[in-house]
């Protein structure tokens, strides 16, 4: 049974401009330490950050809160399995809310094309 659905789209150029203005401080607001390592290794840092931003916004919407009510960007970590499938790991208040919703499965899809990055998150319980 689906208990949450969230979608977000981010304009890559807008994220690149925020990075140019604020430098790494902007990235640190969005990314966890493990994601920052990947960010530094990325050849397209603006695109990388836009995809993570969209994924975390989509996840927060699926929980029903958005980035508010104690839920922060750092409550979400995006990684990948060995085949490249994106994985969403929850911590902090986001993990607590997911537990209250009895979430057992999290599905994350991330896509980007020229100007935009988008993500969809589905939360399921049995």
Curated annotation (Swiss-Prot):
GO terms for cellular component: cytoplasm. The keyword Cell membrane does not apply. GO terms for molecular function: holo-[acyl-carrier-protein] synthase activity; magnesium ion binding. GO terms for biological process: fatty acid biosynthetic process. Its cofactor is Mg(2+). Transfers the 4'-phosphopantetheine moiety from coenzyme A to a Ser of acyl-carrier-protein. This is Holo-[acyl-carrier-protein] synthase.
């Amino acid at each position: 049974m689906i208990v949450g659905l969230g979608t977000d789209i981010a304009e890559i150029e807008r994220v690149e401009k925020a990075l140019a203005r604020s430098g790494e401080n902007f990235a640190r607001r969005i990314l966890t330490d493990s994601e920052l390592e990947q960010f530094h290794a990325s050849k397209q840092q603006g695109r990388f950050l836009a995809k993570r931003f969209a994924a975390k916004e989509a996840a927060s919407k699926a929980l029903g809160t958005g980035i508010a009510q104690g839920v922060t960007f750092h409550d979400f970590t995006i990684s990948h399995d060995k085949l490249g499938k994106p994985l969403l790991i929850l911590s902090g208040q986001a993990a607590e809310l997911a537990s209250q919703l009895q979430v057992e499965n999290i599905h994350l899809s991330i896509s980007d094309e020229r100007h935009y990055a988008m993500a969809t998150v589905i939360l399921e319980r049995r």
